[in-house]
């Protein structure tokens, strides 16, 4: 009797993946669950989730302002949702761990959703005279990549491509262009709008929209959020502070130090 061949090893460690998922902070978990819920809702044929919640310039009005917040949660098909979830999870988890759960909620339900949407509507409707609807969490992916690129630029201004030095802050722009070229039905304008807001976030211009820590501590203490909510990240638990440069690299003393060419991004679309 022939001995069955051993199965090839998995490309990932299931135990480590499970451990990582169990350690995800609260807001990140909620975002992932809402994205999954909207994808499941889109499977039925009675009501179109995409038509209801997409960012459609001509549909924005007093009674449909909710679209400014719903479009990042909605996706077109399983592949769109799956790839965006893979790319968004580490970025959003890192942001929440650094800044706290309440700050993440205030920013992502507020300016980090509405500001990219505002830029997109302004250009798409009033300059391009078009009405292309967009959906997808890649708006947050490119926004967070833009913010991280600014932080990286402060400590490592350039990466080397052969003998050419390229500013590290441009890496999301290259990713945006490549995604638009190689991935069909993507929104270059939507991704670019997100990168612009990400740059502003990384430069600290959106600090005014962050609630003061005194107020956040009062809310946390009054509602006992840390004791009541599992995986909640309090103001005093955040890792590196709100706007500090992450200690992933150290700039060379007395000169600029190029970094190797590397990039963490997504190849998924923001669009129908």
Swiss-Prot record:
It is found in: Membrane. It is a multi-pass membrane protein. It comes from the Eukaryota. Disulfide bonds: none annotated. Keywords: Glycoprotein, Hydrolase, Membrane, Protease, Serine protease, Transmembrane, Transmembrane helix. Glycans are attached at residue 185. GO terms for molecular function: serine-type endopeptidase activity. Disruption phenotype: Impairs growth under hypoxic conditions and leads to increased azole drug susceptibility, reduced siderophore production, and full loss of virulence in a murine model of invasive pulmonary aspergillosis (IPA). The keyword Membrane applies. The active site is at residues 138, 191. One of its GO terms (cellular component) is membrane. Coiled coil: none annotated. GO terms for biological process: proteolysis. Its EC number is 3.4.21.105. The chain crosses the membrane at residues 30-50, 72-92, 103-123, 133-153, 164-184, 186-206. It catalyses: Cleaves type-1 transmembrane domains using a catalytic dyad composed of serine and histidine that are contributed by different transmembrane domains. It holds the Pfam family Rhomboid. Belongs to the peptidase S54 family. Rhomboid protease that catalyzes intramembrane proteolysis. Required for transcription factor srbA activation by mediating its release from the membrane and thereby regulating its activity under hypoxic conditions. Essential for iron homeostasis and resistance to azoles such as voriconazole. Required for virulence in murine models of invasive pulmonary aspergillosis (IPA). This is Rhomboid-type serine protease B. It comes from Aspergillus fumigatus (strain CBS 144.89 / FGSC A1163 / CEA10).
């Amino acid at each position: 009797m022939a001995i069955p061949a051993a199965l090839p090893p998995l490309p990932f460690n299931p135990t480590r993946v499970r451990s990582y998922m169990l350690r995800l902070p609260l807001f990140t978990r909620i975002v992932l669950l809402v994205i999954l819920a909207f994808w499941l809702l889109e499977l039925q044929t009675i009501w179109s989730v995409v038509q209801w919640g997409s960012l459609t310039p001509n549909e924005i009005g007093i009674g449909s302002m909710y679209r400014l917040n719903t479009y990042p949660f909605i996706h077109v098909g399983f592949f769109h949702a799956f790839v965006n979830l893979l790319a968004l999870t580490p970025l959003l988890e890192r942001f929440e761990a650094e800044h706290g759960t309440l700050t993440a909620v205030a920013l992502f339900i507020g300016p980090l959703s509405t500001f990219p949407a505002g830029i997109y509507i302004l250009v798409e409707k009033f300059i391009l005279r078009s009405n292309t609807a967009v959906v997808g969490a890649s708006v947050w992916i490119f926004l967070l990549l833009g913010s991280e690129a600014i932080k990286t630029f402060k400590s490592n201004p350039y990466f080397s491509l052969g003998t050419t030095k390229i500013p590290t802050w441009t890496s999301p722009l290259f990713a945006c262009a490549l995604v638009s070229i190689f991935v069909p039905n993507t929104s270059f304008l939507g991704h670019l709008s997100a990168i612009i807001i990400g740059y502003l976030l990384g430069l600290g211009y959106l600090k005014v929209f962050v609630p003061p820590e005194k107020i956040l501590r009062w809310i946390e203490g009054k509602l006992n959020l840390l004791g009541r909510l599992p995986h909640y990240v309090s103001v005093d638990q955040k890792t590196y502070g709100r706007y500090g440069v992450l200690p992933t690299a150290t700039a060379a003393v007395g000169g600029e130090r190029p970094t190797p060419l590397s990039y963490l991004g997504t190849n998924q679309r923001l669009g129908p």
